[in-house]
Amino acid sequence: MQTIILGGGCFWCTESVFLSVKGVQSVISGYMGGDAVSANYEAVCGGNTGHVEVIKVEFDESIVPLEVILDVFFATHDPTTMDRQGNDVGSQYRSVVFYTDETQKPTIDRTINKLRDMGINVVTEVHPAVEFYQAEDTHQDFFNRNPGQAYCNFAIPPKLAKLRKEFSQYMVS
């Protein structure tokens, strides 16, 4: 089992994508990367903690390799715009990969370089993982528990459609 932490905008959206990927054992929404010694939704959304909304993804690499996890991540968010994902603006929405094992870094670097070789100006930050602050229970499995939420209904279905189109062999049936 491997773990990687991904920040690609609102964690409700990234969580929904990765809950749909075969081999993903758990997805936990949370906060990471800031200077504040604690984190909660209100403080992080205020933009003053330095933390990012992230998801901690635990996956079985014999089912879904890290390369695919990263390809899904980069395909389902905008890695080219600093501190913004759609209407969500602020450093708490920046694109970032936190690796939990040094052996993951070369794969992350290769994936980003592959995108850059294709002319994509990736601004995604890459850092070793630091303390992870789990988000409040209300933010876990958010879209599945709040199917009528307007923001989610606007932002998540296009990401899931892209996942279905480009990574159908890795989607949970």
Swiss-Prot record:
<dbReference type="GO" id="GO:0008113">
    <property type="term" value="F:peptide-methionine (S)-S-oxide reductase activity"/>
</dbReference>
<dbReference type="Pfam" id="PF01625">
    <property type="entry name" value="PMSR"/>
</dbReference>
<protein>
    <recommendedName>
        <fullName>Peptide methionine sulfoxide reductase MsrA</fullName>
        <ecNumber>1.8.4.11</ecNumber>
    </recommendedName>
</protein>
<comment type="function">
    <text>Has an important function as a repair enzyme for proteins that have been inactivated by oxidation. Catalyzes the reversible oxidation-reduction of methionine sulfoxide in proteins to methionine.</text>
</comment>
<keyword id="KW-0560">Oxidoreductase</keyword>
<dbReference type="GO" id="GO:0036211">
    <property type="term" value="P:protein modification process"/>
</dbReference>
<feature type="active site">
    <location>
        <position position="10"/>
    </location>
</feature>
<dbReference type="InterPro" id="IPR002569">
    <property type="entry name" value="Met_Sox_Rdtase_MsrA_dom"/>
</dbReference>
<dbReference type="GO" id="GO:0033744">
    <property type="term" value="F:L-methionine:thioredoxin-disulfide S-oxidoreductase activity"/>
</dbReference>
<comment type="similarity">
    <text>Belongs to the MsrA Met sulfoxide reductase family.</text>
</comment>
<dbReference type="InterPro" id="IPR036509">
    <property type="entry name" value="Met_Sox_Rdtase_MsrA_sf"/>
</dbReference>
